Amino acid sequence: DFVFAQTWPDAVENLKLLDEYGCKPEIELFDLGDIKLLNQMIKNDKIRGPYWVQMITGGTGVAPVIESIQYAEHMLPENSLLSILGVGSGQTPLAAAALVMGHHVRTGMEDNVYYAKGKLAESNAQLVERIVRMANDIGRPLATPAQAREMMGLGAPRAYTFDGRTYGGEVHTLDEMVSDNS
């Protein structure tokens, strides 16, 4: 058993470092009361918009119901981009609701190892493909990496080095990086 504790000064320092390095923080809402903390950080000029907000549903804090999304819509500050993450059995229904409501979705085996009741997911790709299929079925366009960066107020990718090779200006997949360096 352990508790992950982050004090207000810790959070402020982390936000300062993220901003200094041109990174957009993901504000995770484990409880709807966390919106109050986000608003306090904005009021004290500790974070700049647009605000990338990830609402974790299905855990111990946020119920995996549409009303949770509606509450967040009402309470989040302007210039917020809301993404929904469903843990457990709420993942697929909440992802569908988020897409229909015009929000974003996070999926993957970090959050849910099941594809369906009693059926383990084969891969992250399988979970992502389901979200893509759902979005296509309702006519919801998917953002390209460049569009996502623009929505979040991020500039072009900076150059970085991985395993002795420098990348920059273009977005590379992890598969490309690994195959290029093997």
PLM ranges: what are they?
Residues 36, 67-77, 93-182:
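Structured C-terminal cap/extension of enzyme domains
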